[in-house]
């Protein structure tokens, strides 16, 4: 989400191309779709007989019911948070600094690393934190494409649901508590890093 979000925000902000507004609007799709609909749609698209999955199946690459499918679902539901966090920062960024650096002989990579990245990094981390918070407890959009294969594609929310259905409340509570602690540590670390980077950037 972090890398794809930065790349997509950069393309939407810095380049003009046909149907740009349509593509920009598609970013909001995960917010509008019910999670179950998103999960069923992704599973259909990436199954061996789906539009996208059938292409990969020719090379014996399976996407649905694998960890790759879970990753794709996580990216789908999380990338809008990263893109929408970065876009306003890129739009407000003064292009004169980049143009001046280019005139002085700096490479595009150097310009991005020294000028653009320090500006967008706090926003990117904030977006990543939101995407992570959404993904860690996601159920509907992931459960279908995951397939719930034991020890391979079982997702934590589904394990909790299974434990509850078995009336094993202590196990469900323990797993949920571990998830809660893990999420808190990750989000706290992201916020701490974001604060540190902002402080360094502001001198």
For each predicted feature, which ranges?
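Transmembrane-helix boundary motif in ABC transporter permease subunits
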Residues: 1-27, 40, 44, 54, ...
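Generic alpha-helical transmembrane segments of integral inner-membrane proteins
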Residues: 2-7, 33, 124, 128, ...
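Membrane-helix interface segments
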Residues: 15-23, 51-52, 66, 96, ...
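C-terminal transmembrane helix and the adjacent membrane-cytosol boundary/short C-terminal tail
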Residues: 19, 80, 87-102, 111, ...
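Membrane-interfacial helix termini and adjacent extracytoplasmic/periplasmic loops
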Residues: 19-20, 39-75, 109, 145-149
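Transmembrane alpha-helices
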Residues: 29, 76-78, 82-90, 94, ...
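Transmembrane alpha-helices and adjacent helix-loop boundaries
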Residues: 32-39
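Interhelical loop and adjacent transmembrane-helix boundary motif
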Residues: 139-189
